[in-house]
Each structure stands twice: as C-alpha cells, then as structure tokens.
Design a protein with these regions (language model features):
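Fe-S-dependent hydro-lyases/dehydratases of central metabolism
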Residues: 1-634
Length: 634
C-alpha cells in the first residue's frame, strides 16, 4: 500500500518486500523510524551496488524460496554483498510472477545486503493498478553504460529445489542431495548444535532417517516469504485430491494478509487445502519467530519462512528444549505433506503451476477496519495505559571514564538478534522495558541478566556516593553482594583510580563481547534491553548488520570493534577500563586505548570506534536517542 516505482520505504522490520515494485526498502530499528517521524534525514554513506543479472526460467517444482536459498548460500558467508544494494536486472525477470519476484526479494535480507531493487515492467504496472495505484508505476531500467561494483549471474534455469539446513538460511544444499544422503548432512547439523549448546541439550535428527528416507514432523508455510498467494495456490494444487495422512506430520498454512486470505477463500484454494488435512490459520507471521506452531522438542520442521536461526522457532534450550528447522519452498513442503511427511521434492510431483491471471484485491477489508490518523491529530485524546505499560528508565550520559564489567562472552561465529532478545512469548512485554529485559540472552546465556544486574547494583552504589576505594555503605534498596564489591574495589586498586575519579568521573557498566553480533531482526530491543540493564557497550570483531549497529548507537551502547588480528581473552566478570572515553568520543577519535583486567593481571588492549559520524557521536555522548531529542526540545 506504500510502495511505488522510484520510492524508498524505511520499515521497522528487517524484511522488506518492496524491491520487486521498484522501491528501495530498508529495515531498521525503531530509533531510525523515530528520526523519520520527526522529519529528520536518514544518513547513509553511498553503498556499493551489485548487479544481479537474472536469466533463464524456473523449472518445474522450483519456487522463489529455492532461488533465495541458493543466493544466500552463494554470498552470505563470504560477505560478498554485505551492506550493499542489489539491483535485479535481466530477461529472466519477465518470466517471474510478481509473487515470485517478491518471494525472492524479501529474502535478500538474509544475504546481509542493505537493500534490493528490481527493474520494472508491465507486470509491476498491472500489480500496482490492481491495488488501486496505477499512477505509482514508472519504468525503471539501468542506463546505458551503468557501472556496478560487482556482478552476480543468476540463471533461474540452473536452480533446483533447495533446502537450508539448521541454523541459517545460508546452509544451502540441494533437496536432491538431502534426500539422497540425509544421514550424513543431518549428522553435521547435530555436531554444530553440540558445538553451540554443549551437553546441556541435544538435537537428534539422524534418528528421523528410516529405511534411507527422512521423515519430518511438521510443515509450515507462513509469513512475508511463504504466505504469498502463488505459494499457497501451488501447495493446494499439489495436494489436490490427496491428503497429508493421520500420522505425526502436521501441516499449517498462514496467508500474509486479510485481502489475500479472502481471495484464497473465494477462489477455493483454502477449500482444497482443508480437504487435504492442512490446517489453515489466520494471517499471522507467528511461526517465523516462535509465536505459533512451535515444534515439539527434538522435532524437525520444514518451513517456507524467512529464518531458521537457533531457537527462533520457539524452543528453550535452558529448559532442555531444541528443535531443527529446514527452510524449503512451499512447493516441496506440499510435496512432502502429500507423501505423509517423507521428504519429497516438488520436482518429482506432477501438478499444475498455472498462475492465477484474474487476481483480485479487495481493499474494503482495510477501509472498514484500519484507522488512518496521519495528518489528523487529536491532542486532547488521552492515552490509555494498562498495568503492563511502563516508562523507560532514565539513561545516563556518557561519563568521562568508563569501567566495563564483562557479563557475556559469546564466541559463536555469529550471534543473532533472536539470541540477544527472543521474540515469541516475550513480545507481550515490549511495552514494559524492565520486564522485557529479563529475557535478554535467556536462550543463549541464562547467567547474563543476573550478572548485568550485579554490575548495575555496583554503579548504583557508586552513583549514590556509597562506594569508595576501600569502604562501602550498603543501601537496602540496592541488592549487592559483598564479593562483587570486593572485586570492583580490587579493580580500582589495580587500575590506580583515585577517590575523586571513582566518585565523580566514572561510570560502571556492563558489556557483551560477541564475535559478530546482530544478524537477523531489526528489533531495537536487542540493544535497548542491554541498555535497560545498564549495559554500556558491545565489543566485537564486526557487526553482522548495519541495522543492529545503528540500534546500539541509538540506545547509547558504544559499538566498539577489535582489530582482526587481536585476540580477546576476556571472560565473564573481568573488567575493561577506558579512560577519557567521553573526551575521545567528542573529539572524533576512532582509537581507544583500554586496559583489560583478566586473572588479576592488566593487559593493554585497543578498541575502535570507526565509521561514526558526528550525529552518532552526539547520541553516544547524550546517552541515547531519547536524551538527544529531549535536549533539542523535540
């Protein structure tokens, strides 16, 4: 309802489906969206542009998710398109329906690119006209002699049905390989799970191979990638006249919107699915982030959704739960459902892929229900607060000197935002910052929150003037352990801090170290929850996404990086002292000498704050975006 050729849309979800409509869509956290609501600029260095040259035509049984998984597998791990813009151009685009284009485009987020946009044609014109916005169409094509930084050749004819194994969309294998050798491939997945979760919880996938065939327990088609009309219609065509069986295989289908849900009902698609035994749910993307159809413990689910990150589907490893999710296209999921849960490729099933030519869009369902208040303010209307709606705690400005206590060390190759703050059941607490913060890293490191709270208690004592180099006066409302006080006082002594510095020019905050944090969702809560717990920084070798780094800055978390050649020896409970941190941020330094206290010894380390513009530095000095706008009177 917002996209148009040549436009740009900034959305608060990491997945955007606008590129196929000639719109540059970028997913960002709430802080960046707030800047736009206040009519400020979206500041971005000019990104590199990658040409995705699309040729060929999709084979029978191949859908948009197969293309997307193949693309993710080719470019994610090597960082080929990270923070770049993809331009889809070529004769192959004309053979794709709009739903197929959108289904590929929405998954470009999983390549780590910044955004993606497609050249437009008559199909885009007709799509916009169908939605009552014919005037928003204009042809978009590269100019003659257009120069690109990189090239990806995407031959649709070469794509076959694919599968993305746990725990990332880039773990791409052909479905043909997985069907032929399920034991070997799934054994590797079990080893990766063991390496990440240790002996606390185990994932058993190889025992699902019976007589050489892989049996799965659940199939789901849902969300912004899976729940498109063409995908669901193709699934219904595959299942037409058959059934999913009465065994332990479950199959659920979620449409993406009420207008599409209505069209599926009116065209009889939903009827055919229901008769096959599929469960047709309301339009909701819940299964994608663990808010619906959570698999059973140790189950294997095949899904046409966007992600299969660890625990994103809703499992809780801290309670002994773990499940595996394999991403597949809706067509092969339906083929598997037709085979009662035995993994099957849609390429091996006869069905009619004919795309519905007489599509309809009934906007009345929105007109009757959606309130449109933009440009019609009602300042006298009171806000209604419930008991679970709470104010944000006061967030301090950046101090002159900073003492960080390490409260989590995550040495996985990548740390996702789903691990930093789970979604699903926690979403009901997003209006209550303190309650939501209790779930921070709960499915990855259950000890983080208690450790962060202990660090925050030390800072509360210090700020109250009750924590000195050798003495402490406990306050009843500040729960602090004597051993924590002794540890921080020893840190003061080793660092040579004087009484005046501790009382007036120091802040004690927590810090998370991760090799590469922030892959996945745009949810700013991945950063804000750390800040609510009095976190002060992240330290990493690189940030997985621009949007997570922006979230850190907007919430006042210093986004420090390490040089690739520098090892990080810090452990939970260690301290990192950064002298003159406020002065260095203010004057634009990108190098920050620091001291790591590890094992009773001091070690000099260097932290970096690179590619940080003047506005970002102002936000960091103020403590967060809220403070920044409060100071400006906005």
């Amino acid at each position: 309802m917002l996209a148009g050729c040549g436009r740009m849309v900034l959305g608060s979800d990491s997945h955007t489906r606008y590129g196929a409509l000639g719109t540059m869509g970028v997913g960002e956290g709430g802080g960046e969206i707030v800047k736009q609501l206040l009519r400020n600029t979206y500041d971005l260095s000019a990104p590199q542009v990658v040409l995705v040259h699309v040729t060929g035509k999709l084979r029978h049984g191949v859908g948009p998710h197969d293309v997307a998984i193949a693309l993710c597998g080719a470019v994610y791990k090597n960082g080929f398109v990270k923070n770049k813009v993809l331009e889809f151009v070529g004769d192959g685009i004309g053979g794709l329906s709009m739903d197929q284009r959108i289904g590929i485009d929405v998954m470009t987020t999983e390549t780590a690119c910044l955004s993606s946009v497609w050249e437009t044609d008559g199909a885009v014109r007709d799509y916009l006209a169908l939605h009552g916005r014919a005037e928003d169409y204009r042809p978009l094509h590269p100019e003659d002699g257009a120069y690109y930084d990189s090239l990806i050749e995407l031959d649709l004819s070469a794509i076959e049905p694919m599968a993305a194994l746990p725990f990332h969309p880039s773990e791409a294998v052909t479905l043909r390989e997985l069907i032929a050798s399920p034991g070997d491939l799934l054994r590797d997945v079990e080893k990766r799970a063991e390496a990440q979760f240790g002996s606390k919880v185990q994932l058993h996938l190889t025992d699902k191979v019976k007589d050489g065939r892989l049996r799965v327990e659940q199939g789901v088609i849902a969300g912004c990638a899976g729940g498109l009309y063409d995908n669901i219609a193709a699934a219904a065509s595959i299942l037409d006249g058959s059934d999913i069986g009465s065994g332990n295989f479950d199959f659920s289908v979620y449409p993406p919107s009420v207008p599409v849900e209505l069209e599926l009902v009116e065209n009889g698609v939903t009827t055919r699915l229901l008769r096959s035994g599929a469960v047709c749910k309301p339009c909701f993307c819940g299964p994608c982030f663990g808010a619906g159809d959570v698999p059973a413990n140790d189950a294997l689910s095949i899904r046409h959704t966007t992600r299969n990150f660890p625990n994103r589907e809703g499992s809780k490893p801290g309670e002994g739960q773990l499940a595996g999710v394999i991403l597949m296209d809706a067509r092969s999921i339906a083929a598997t459902a037709k085979n009662h849960g035995i993994l099957t490729s849609a390429a091996d099933v006869e069905y009619d892929e004919t795309v519905e030519k007489n599509r309809r869009f009934d906007a009345s369902v929105y007109a009757k229900r959606v309130y449109r208040g933009y440009g019609r303010p009602q300042p006298d209307t009171p806000l209604q607060y419930g008991p679970n709606i709470a104010e944000w705690p006061e967030i301090p400005e950046l101090s002159q000197n900073l003492l960080l206590q390490i409260c989590a060390v995550l040495r996985d190759e990548v740390t996702t935002t789903d691990e930093l703050i789970p979604s699903g059941e926690t979403s009901s607490y997003r209006s209550n910052p303190m309650k939501l913060a209790e779930f921070t890293l709960s499915r990855r490191d259950a000890g983080y929150v208690p450790r962060a709270k202990a660090t925050a208690a030390l800072e509360s004592l210090r700020a109250a003037g009750k924590l000195s180099l050798s003495k402490v006066r406990h306050l009843e409302h500040i729960p602090v352990q004597e051993v924590d006080v002794q540890v921080v006082q020893e840190a003061f002594r080793v660092l040579g801090l004087d009484e005046d510095t501790v009382r007036h020019d120091l802040h004690i905050g927590s810090v998370i170290f991760a090799n590469k944090p922030g892959d996945g969702s745009a949810r700013e809560q991945a950063a804000s929850c750390q800040r609510v717990l009095r976190g002060s920084a992240n330290i990493c070798y690189e940030f997985a996404t621009k949007r997570y780094r922006s979230n850190c800055v907007n919430w006042g978390l210093l986004p420090f990086t390490l040089a690739p050649e520098d090892s990080f020896e810090g452990a939970d409970g260690d301290f990192i002292y950064i002298p003159r941190v406020r002065e260095r941020v203010a004057q634009g330094d990108d190098t920050f000498p620091a001291v790591l206290l590890h094992g009773g010894e001091k070690k000099s380390i260097t932290l970096y704050l690179k590619n940080t513009n003047s506005e970002e530095r102002e936000l960091l000095l103020r403590g967060c975006l809220i403070n920044h706008y409060a100071a400006k009177g906005k």
